């Protein structure tokens, strides 16, 4: 089977493709398309995205960053939910009082000892030292007059 002549020389195919694309991209700068026309000979129409340039790229970057942060938050929320569900399915944590312990305490035969609040009211006196008036300040002489012309 013979290879077609155009595929034997791929550079010819590339040149033909580029010439077709450039013919399509020639600008027809009418009144409604004027803002998207780029300078050149012949003038070519820029795409809307090239026209708005930096605004699009900044917005795109902000959107990508926001999307990544949002997805990370969703993943963290799902992970927390999974961990909480797995934790609640296990037994109680170490150190939590079980019902057998509560029953042992409540079934104690003797009454608890009397409780008094008085020891809480007796606190050591930790007061500041007594008030001592500040010594009178010595009077400083008034400052010298301003060296400029008087205001009179």
Curated annotation (Swiss-Prot):
Membrane topology reported for the UniProt record: Single-pass type I membrane protein
Protein's UniProt keywords contain Iron-sulfur: no
Annotated protein name in UniProt: Cysteine and tyrosine-rich protein 1
Membrane-side (Cytoplasmic) residue stretches: 81-152
Keywords per UniProt: Membrane, Signal, Transmembrane, Transmembrane helix
InterPro entries in alphabetical order: CYYR1
CC annotations in GO: membrane
Family: Belongs to the CYYR1 family.
Localization: Membrane
Superkingdom in the source lineage: Eukaryota
Segments in the Extracellular topological domain: 28-59
Annotated TM spans: 60-80
Signal peptide segment: 1-27
Pfam families: CYYR1
Region called Disordered, residue ranges: 130-152
């Amino acid at each position: 089977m013979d290879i077609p002549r155009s595929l034997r020389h791929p550079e010819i195919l590339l040149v033909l493709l580029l010439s077709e694309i450039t013919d399509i991209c020639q600008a027809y700068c009418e009144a409604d398309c004027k803002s998207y026309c780029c300078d050149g000979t012949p003038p070519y129409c820029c795409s809307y995205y090239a026209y708005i340039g930096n605004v699009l790229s900044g917005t795109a970057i902000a959107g990508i960053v926001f999307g990544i942060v949002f997805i990370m938050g969703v993943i963290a929320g799902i992970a927390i939910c999974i961990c909480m569900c797995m934790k609640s399915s296990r037994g109680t944590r170490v150190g939590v009082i079980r019902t057998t312990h509560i029953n042992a305490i409540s079934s104690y035969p003797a009454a608890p000892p009397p409780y008094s609040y008085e020891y809480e009211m007796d606190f050591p006196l930790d007061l500041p030292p007594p008030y001592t008036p500040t010594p009178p300040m010595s009077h400083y002489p008034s400052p010298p007059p301003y060296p400029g012309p008087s205001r009179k």
